[in-house]
């Protein structure tokens, strides 16, 4: 399952659960779980709403991290295999 792929990252970050990287990591896990759930249950609109809320939170955290520390942002993006933010 998805949880098993990120165990090493989670063990590494267990002492710093409040860090931006750990929060983005946990939101990414939730997003992947909800996405697989919604593939089976297409009409679960409350889960769709929750997914959109989590996506927004992760997007705001990634924007913050990209402004504060671009190197850590790039490493996190590559490690979690997610796309970069769209810039205006």
Swiss-Prot record:
GO molecular function terms noted in the UniProt entry: structural constituent of ribosome
Keywords noted in UniProt: Chloroplast, Plastid, Ribonucleoprotein, Ribosomal protein
Subcellular location: Plastid, Chloroplast
InterPro entries: Ribosomal_uS15, Ribosomal_uS15_bac-type, uS15_NS1_RNA-bd_sf
Major site of localization recorded for this protein: plastid
The keyword Acyltransferase appears for this protein: no
Keyword Repeat: no
Residues in coiled coil: none
Any one biological process term the GO annotation gives: translation
GO cellular component, as recorded: chloroplast; ribonucleoprotein complex; ribosome
Gene3D superfamilies per UniProt: S15/NS1, RNA-binding
UniProt cross-references to HAMAP family, sorted A to Z: Ribosomal_uS15_B
Family assignment from sequence similarity: Belongs to the universal ribosomal protein uS15 family.
Subunit structure: Part of the 30S ribosomal subunit.
Protein name per Swiss-Prot or TrEMBL: Small ribosomal subunit protein uS15c
Natural source organism: Capsella bursa-pastoris (Shepherd's purse)
Source organism phylogeny: Eukaryota, Viridiplantae, Streptophyta, Embryophyta, Tracheophyta
Gene designation: rps15
